[in-house]
Amino acid sequence: MYADGDTVVESETPRDRDARAESWLQTSMLECIGRFGLDAVRVLDIILASFCAHAVHHYPFFLSVIRRVPWSSARIAEVLGFQYAHYTHPDTRESTPEELYLLTALLIREKVVSFAQMLAYVSPDDTIQKLKQAHDEALTSKTATVGANALTMAAPLIDDDHDSSAASSTTPANTVDAAPPPPPSPQGIFLIRALLRCGALDEVRGFLAAHPWIFGAYPSVTHAYLRLVWYRLDTPAFRDAVTRFAGTGNDQTSVLTMYVPEPHATRTHRYIFCVRDWAHGHAPLNQVEEVFELLSPLGVYVCQDRRLLQLLCRVCAQAPSKEAWMPFLRTQVLPAVTLANGGAPLLYELWECIQTLPYPQRYSLYGEWKHRSTKRPELRYAKMRTEREARGILRRISSDNVRASGRGLAKAAHAHPTVFFEVVLHQIQSYDNLIEPVVDSAKYLTPLEYDVLTYALLEALSDPGKARTKQDGTNTSLWLKSLASFAGALFRKYAAMDCTPILQYLANRLHEGQVADLVVLSELILKMAGIEPMGELSDAQMAALSGGPLLQTEAHLTLIPGTTPAAVLLARNSLKKGAMRLYRTLMQNRLAVPLLILVAQQREACVFSDDDVHIKSLSSTFDTCVSILLQYTHFLMSHCLLYTSPSPRDRQKS
């Protein structure tokens, strides 16, 4: 048996190999047993030991021999069990060899012994449950370490005045701490890994479905499973991304290996898995439902192959209908993105997948993505790690280090955008001096993160547990003012962000009679168009309002600070672009006139909303409604002229 190119070629045909195995069995083994009175079980043990020593290069011959031996399946499993038990004995320093796992996996695949028979020897009693308990405890400990601060993790202080000798004298001299029991041997897990490497998926499918935590605790098992997934995804829809780039060296020597994935090729050697027919019986998948069924046992642990995640997102983006993909995106892809830490490339692929969905459907995905973070230990750990990184970045961010802070902010947001932006908005509600540096730092975000940020902003604005006004009932709460100002600055600076959800939310709130959220509309107009609510007018503004449309627009514009005329002109151009985007969004979503009507209705209805409200609060609310109504009306009028005025070509036609 030798390696040639990408396959392993045998030097003899199966018929010749079977004949040689039969001849050796009759003339050598059985004859020696009868002539010398050898122990038959001991002979079987020697055969299996020889098989183990030559499993990589000569497994076909030994399989032919084992198929013809006179011992029963139970007897072969028993002898193998004794070999496994030898390596779990406390006096044995060697670990179980990989060749023994490979030998057993081949025998199970060839139906010589069954997986259930071997499982009784390699994982007796409650070994699997103990391994799961140890894995859960490790995750819990890691999560607790992330949530603890440096003070709680520090060692207790020593009292200098306390007599250490007296303390030591009270401790019995013969007291010895009991050593913790050794962890159970994961032989059963490694046997499953060997079976997956050999392509025996049907034998372990039920066991993996009952114990999905194995994929998270033992990444090598996941890699062996994903190898089968990649092979079965070799279909026209997946083929372009599945193609692997083989080595180009012509002088490389092929070397057999029993490890999966194969070791990286060197300048002189290329490694090939020794079992050449590992993919026998695994046909390529033709239906999307079959792909989901194959990936279902992995759950969120598909995160261990970021290339596969990108491939699935690309295929989903090209799908004519995404209804079949939605459960898969909710339960596996989005949580896997959190654990994969794939950075911006993975988020770009995910955005291509979901950008065509309507925003209510996208936001439902984001909401489940966020709230699913508390259901698994791995996701809880990722959530707490993201929260800690977000707080650390916000403590260091300032207007002086926007470039460095922006890159750090984007890198931290890539892992879990929903959780990260929740922390950012919570800090902005308390510290409005973070608005400007955070807005400037957001330029490194991906389109998906811009969309998630809009969702997080909408969720923060609609929080029913926070009061919209202060205790005096007159002034708007600081948290709402901060969020409104942040929203206006954000939508003005980044054209990739869509403010349609915020405008629709304002329309819904006004329809319910809630006027406190009008401050969000006012800030959007102020920040994006530069039109501020009219307060006490100066003489110059009064004179400008008596002029034409251009002078009236100048009277409503906010004061633009600038050291040079060029800076002022640049700021004016930015306001014009932001105003056009806002007006276009209102017109395309048919919200311009409904919002105008709703604001006008609230101006009339706000004074009759509640009989118990103080007259000062009512008058303040009425003044606010009137001011914002005039602000919004002037915004619509000033930009409606740009859309309705005929062009020179239209004038010539008329």
Where are these regions (language model features)?
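Conserved small/polar residues in nucleotide/adenosyl-binding loops
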Residues: Y643-D650
